[in-house]
Amino acid sequence: MKRVFTTISLALVALVACNKAEEPVAAEQQGSVSISCNVTSEVEDTRAEVSCTQPAIDEFSLTIDGISQDYHAEYASVAEFQESYLHNGRYKASVKAGDLNVEGYDCATFEGEAEFKVVSRQHTDVEVTATIANSLVKVEVTEAFKSYFAGGYEFTLKTELGNEYDVTEQSNYLFVAPTSIEILATATKQPNESGAEGKVITLPTERIENLKPRTTYVVKFDVSTAGDATLQITLNDSLVEERNIDNELNQYA
């Protein structure tokens, strides 16, 4: 019996010694990491900030994925991560607040990501900048358009997600998913000299595809009365459509 107890005791001592030897090795392969998040509502094309509600930092979820190794972790909030230890290697931190499936005015979704490297026994500070993930759209008309279509006009914007918005008198940007949109419109011409009511004209559908995140799209409708009345549609000040109103659009009246 003494031999049995002695054998077991020696085995336990060896196991404890082995575990103690492994602990420093594991620690040597890890580094500490802190992650912070900042938010900007600056858009890509103008470098100006747009007016929208920015989420608080604790509203951002955090995902960490390994790049040089198999690793994945999710946190409901950036604050939940605090300071943690990760094994040596390269990682990517992604933050998100909002939902791109929720479109509308002041419905901004913010996303951001940053890659970082963990080095043994070193501390790494990671800063992730979250930017607007939506596309921002606004429909405008010129005074010349209003004057020519004095009988009134209606504009409807449709998104790829199936949402529809009345943008007849739009003053703020509409936050939509970065996919594609369609703008449909009807306009009533001014009464003629005999007093007859003006004709209602269906304007050409304006479709914009491959929208980009963090980018503004201003679609402007204008009427040029130099010579024949001409409908002009611009996208961010670039002409994308031009139609003779009497010859090309009256057929849709």
Where are the regions a protein language model picked out?
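Sec-dependent bacterial lipoprotein signal peptides
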Residues: M1-V16
